[in-house]
Amino acid sequence: MAQPITGVTASITPKIRPVRRASLKRGFLCVFIARRWRRSHVDLGILLVTGPTGSGKTTTLYTALSRLNTAERKIITVEDPVEYQLEGINQIQVKPAIGLDFAGALRSIVRQDPDVIMIGEIRDLETCRIAIQSSLTGHLVLSTLHTNSAAASITRLLDMGVESYLIASTVSGILAQRLVRRLDPATRVAFEAPPELIAEHGLDRLTEQRPILLYRGGYHGRSAITELLVMNDELRGLLMRHADAATLEQAARRAGLRTLHEEGLRQALAGVTSLEEVLRVTRGEGA
């Protein structure tokens, strides 16, 4: 009779990523690229997408690439792994076992004179320096970082050892995002927001609707909440003076940035998601 295993145990969580062709011409990410990133009017520089694992960063990058993909542009990606096959785009999967890491792949592709470079993730200083050098020599560079907010990405780059003047001269925009569960319109129910919730979250400053309504119900699908930091002269000046993330965020808000928390509250008021869901994914980030 087999004896139960005791003591040391193992746990395996497989993550199956079938390589497939991307179908990214619809949905909130496509609208975001069209309305928001293009608003920054940048052709060169570094655009970063930041957020925790599972927040949709890679999908956002793929959507951006599908928007940028034209016959006139040469686009090369370095990824780990290649999650979607994008027609007309050269995609490289890193293989550390044979010595092909992000930095090595990037050193190779910059010699191929691409117009756009997508780096799956900036993981170390060497990769970051090559990305910066690429942007300084006329390439648009897209990549991701793991930080809690757009402003925190700047301090993360500083902590990695990147000089402040290089960040100021190369980073064009940073998008932070989270995914929230979307309320199912078939089961969604509106209710009047209690006064304590209105006061706690400042809901009366975000909508002119009276009474103020929130929504609850079952969930179906997901939606993104985002904050977009576009580099401007004030931010560059603060960066050169080594301002912290909070100071950078305050300056970005004066220029029109909506924090993840505020954007989430607006979606809750619009019935896209519930207040509870917004608080779940943004707690501690401007809440």
Region spans (language model):
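Short, flexible helix-loop junctions that flank or precede catalytic/ligand sites
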Residues: 1, 12, 22, 31-287
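Intrinsically disordered, low-complexity segments enriched in small polar residues
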Residues: 6-7, 11, 23, 27
